[in-house]
C-alpha cells in the first residue's frame, strides 16, 4: 500500500516523461533521480552508477551482453554456473552462437559454487565471471566476496545476479569486489517491471 501511494501521483496527474524539459517531465525526472539516489544509497554506490531496466532479466541480459561486447578485444571467454537464472544462461547461450566460449561450473550438494573451481576456470581470454548472489531455488548464498577477490586478482570483471539477495542481506559495492550487480524491485515490495544494474569502476553504454 505504501508503494502504491508513492506511485499513484506519477500514474495520474504527474505523468510527464522524465526525459523531456517541460514541467511535468521535470517533476518526473526529479522523482526518478530520487529513486536512483535511494537505490545507490542502499548499495553504497554513486547515483551515476545505477542504471534502471525493466526488471531482473533485462538487468542480467544487459550486464552479460554489454561486457561481452565492450571487452571482446580482451577475449571471448565467460565463466558462470549451471544453476544461474535463465536470464544469465540464455544470454550465455546466445553469446556462444556468436563465437564466445562459456564455462558452466558445477555446484556442490548445497548449490554452492567453489571459488577454487572459479580460479582454475580462468583463462587468459576470460572477460567476465557471472555468479548469482543468492539462489532462487534453494536459497544458497554464494561465496561472492571470495569469487570477487579472485576476479580482481586475475583482472576479470565480475557480475552477480543479486535479485534474490538485494534488500535481504547487506550488500555494499564499495566493500564487495563486484563490478556489476543486478536487482529487481518486485523482490522487495516494489513495482513489477522495474530493475537496476549497478556498475562500479566502469564506463558502459546505457542506450
PLM regions with names:
Residues 199-206:
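Conserved small/polar residues in nucleotide/adenosyl-binding loops
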Residues 1-20:
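N-terminal "arm"/small-domain region of PLP-dependent enzymes with the aminotransferase-like
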Residues 18-58, 62:
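Conserved N-terminal alpha-helix of the aminotransferase class I/II PLP-enzyme fold
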Residues 103, 107-165:
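Active-site phosphate-binding strand-loop segment of PLP-dependent enzymes
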Residues 160, 164-166, 172-189, 195:
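Conserved active-site segment immediately N-terminal to the catalytic lysine
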Residues 67-89, 101, 106:
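Conserved PLP-anchoring active-site segment centered on the Schiff-base-forming lysine
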Residues 46-50, 74-76, 124-125:
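Short acidic capping loops at alpha-helix termini that bridge into adjacent secondary structure
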Amino acid at each position: 500500500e505504501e508503494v502504491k501511494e508513492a506511485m499513484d501521483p506519477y500514474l495520474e496527474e504527474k505523468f510527464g516523461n522524465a526525459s523531456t524539459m517541460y514541467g511535468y517531465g521535470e517533476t518526473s525526472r526529479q522523482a526518478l533521480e530520487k529513486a536512483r539516489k535511494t537505490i545507490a544509497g542502499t548499495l553504497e554506490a554513486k547515483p551515476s552508477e545505477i542504471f534502471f531496466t525493466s526488471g531482473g532479466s533485462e538487468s542480467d541480459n544487459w550486464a552479460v551482453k554489454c561486457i561481452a561486447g565492450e571487452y571482446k578485444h580482451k577475449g571471448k571467454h565467460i565463466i558462470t554456473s549451471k544453476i544461474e537464472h535463465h536470464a544469465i544462461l540464455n544470454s550465455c547461450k546466445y553469446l556462444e552462437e556468436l563465437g564466445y566460449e562459456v564455462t558452466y561450473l558445477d555446484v556442490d550438494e548445497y548449490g554452492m559454487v567453489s571459488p577454487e573451481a572459479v580460479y582454475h576456470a580462468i583463462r587468459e581470454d576470460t572477460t567476465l565471471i557471472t555468479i548469482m548472489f543468492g539462489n532462487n531455488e534453494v536459497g544458497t548464498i554464494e561465496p561472492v566476496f571470495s569469487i570477487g577477490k579472485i576476479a580482481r586478482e586475475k583482472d576479470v570483471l565480475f557480475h552477480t545476479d543479486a535479485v534474490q539477495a538485494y534488500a535481504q542481506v547487506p550488500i555494499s559495492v564499495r566493500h564487495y569486489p563486484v563490478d556489476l550487480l543486478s536487482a529487481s524491485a518486485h523482490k522487495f515490495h516494489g513495482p513489477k517491471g522495474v530493475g537496476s544494474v549497478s556498475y562500479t569502476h566502469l564506463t558502459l553504454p546505457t542506450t
